[in-house]
Amino acid sequence: MAQAVAAYEKVWRDYLSNKCNLAERQAIAHLQSLAALDAAERTADTHVTEADFAYIAGATRGNDVQLLERALKAYGQHLNLIPFNTNARRMMAETYMRLRRYEEAFDVFDELLNMLSDFKEDEIGELEIAPFRLRHDADQLELLLGCGDIKIGMADSMTDAIRFFRELADDLDRGAVRVDTDSVSQRIRRTRVKSLPAEAQARLYLHGYNRLPPLKGLGVGARSLHGLCDRAFWVEKDPLAHHPKAVWADIAEKYVSERLVVVDEFLSADALEELRRFVARAPIFRTMRAGFLGSFPADGATHVVIRKLAESLRERLPSLLDKQPLGLWWFFKYTDEAPNGIGIHADPAAVNINIWLTPDEARVRGGGLTVFKRVADDRSAVADYNHEFASEEAEMVLRQQLEEGGSVHVEYRANRAVIFISDQFHVSEPFEFKRGYENHRVNLTLLFGDRLATSQAGVAEAPHAAARDTSADDLFG
């Protein structure tokens, strides 16, 4: 058994370290062994192991449909036996994404949101907490109350939650609440709920921390936040229809020659306003970073506009995206605690599209993006080039090395999209936005394809190959 576990972990490790050929060979060999098992020998563990190997083999073979379909079948068999395995459910959603079965993937992510929100009181201790998150959630609940989105009869309990979240945030800031310092990181500005006194933990659970609030249209057992959007309306809309066809040919050509393209007025006006409304009102910002909040697919970032955007982009940029499905996306919302934005990093994908959503009127200064010409080493694992730095000094050392290779700076502008090679290092420009919940800087990032998939990506191969000429191999030992 120990040998089987070690073999399984090695395949994943090789895959995540971009040793794709090695991971593929091992995954196929293990799949052949699993195929020899008869029905009586198959268990929940063998089903999920088969699913993972089929997923890895399918991904490394350019999203091979037969292998990915095999993965879906095996994930389904596993979940029939162990329905609450959130990791298996997440992998099922990611498999659907590789097959471009986006609607089914979004439904599975919605199921994950429901499962992850339905936790017991003794499980709250493992959640992260920070004053900026508490203030954000209080402000959002206040907005939802004012908009009439909270169910009738629940206003008083939500008002109590708002008051408690703000009081606890203030207490944490001034040190009035005892916190287990072993669980605290000043650099990342957050801690675990379990580091708080038992009374505070109990009150957080009572007031629904990190759970879905009682929204109208979100009934018992509801699987998503679709009540906050008109899904039927947006399914029929194209968020890019306002651009003439010639624009997309220019974008594709410029991407090949310059490796970075800026597109203004990217989303249609109604799609932009819909996403702004969604990020303001939807309780989806459940992931924390150093002073800012993230919303990923399993957090509820599954508005149908995102799916329609992915489909529309493939139609308009086939040379870039025909073989590069949407793999991951997120919203980042920067509170007043994060005036520096996100630190230097690269993202594990082929094509990155970053879209700024917050109106220009909210911006005082800064907020743009610097994209360095160097890319992450092919041999590096994701954690090597996408992580929170232990200190400002460590980040500055990397920045100085990257600047030697050159960079491009893009100024902030609402509804501006920046399209670039995803594993080029990039960093936010420090900024100041007006204070207030409605003025938080928000961006939507879409990642398409795999880092090493560009050999299958037609015209997109050329700029990525050029980027490799200035690889950051020397930045990581």
Task: List PLM regions with ranges.
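Non-heme Fe(II)/2-oxoglutarate
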Residues: A198, A222-Q324, L328-P339
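Canonical positions in the second alpha-helix
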Residues: H30, L34-A36, Q77-H78, E111-L112
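Residue at a conserved register position within TPR or TPR-like alpha-solenoid repeats
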Residues: D14, A54, R61-G62, Y96
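Short coil turns that delineate tetratricopeptide repeat
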Residues: A39-E41, P83, S117
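Catalytic core of non-heme Fe(II) oxygenases with the double-stranded beta-helix
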Residues: K323-L328, F332-G477
